[in-house]
Design a protein with these regions (language model features):
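Active-site-proximal, substrate-binding regions of enzyme catalytic domains
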Residues: 43-79
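A cross-family signal for key residues in well-ordered alpha-helices
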Residues: 11-12, 24, 44, 83, ...
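Short, well-structured N-terminal submotif of metal-dependent ribonuclease cores
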Residues: 1-37, 49-61, 123
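Structured helix-beta-strand junction loops
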Residues: 29-30, 66-70, 105, 123
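Active-site neighborhoods of divalent-metal-dependent phosphate/nucleic-acid chemistry enzymes
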Residues: 69-115
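Contiguous, function-dense segments enriched for cysteine-driven chemistry
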Residues: 11-19, 68, 74-75, 110-117, ...
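Acidic, PIN/NYN-like endoribonuclease modules and their adjacent C-terminal/linker elements
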Residues: 2, 35, 99-131
């Protein structure tokens, strides 16, 4: 089965967050898919964590490297449709890209973002429950 994986799940695994083991259990043996903006979003999140001192400079590249070792199929998304979703539900376009990916591929979504879960569910997307 293909599973659309949100950026925060990659970071939770790489940073050994409490949700790490459950994410791995839920996705083991399945194919992860994400919008092709995933590497950029991971890079942005890591630089924000560095800026907020959540990670140290010497951790930045090793954490990046771990996220890049997780196999994922990067897909383009219909940005126009994603923007409609972002506008309708007042969410960031980046979040809407993951929802649009799940809708267009008829795949479940795994995320730690509660608002994204609410919006995706309201649009008929199946959620892989982590929390």
């Amino acid at each position: 089965m293909k599973i659309i994986a949100d950026t925060n799940t990659f970071l939770a695994v790489a940073l050994y967050e409490p949700e790490r083991e459950k994410i791995i259990r839920l996705t083991l043996g399945h194919d992860l898919v994400a919008p092709d903006i995933l590497p950029f979003e991971i890079g942005n999140a890591l630089s924000a964590m560095l800026k907020r001192k959540r990670i140290q400079p010497e951790e930045l590249l090793p954490v990046w490297d771990v996220t890049q070792q997780i196999p994922v199929d990067l897909r383009s998304v219909n940005i126009r449709e994603a923007l409609k979703t972002a506008s309708k539900f007042n969410i960031y376009a980046y979040d809407a890209y993951f929802i649009e990916c799940a809708i267009s591929l008829y795949c479940p979504l795994i995320t730690l973002d509660q608002r994204m879960i609410e919006v995706a569910r309201s649009m008929g997307v199946k959620i892989m429950e982590v929390i």
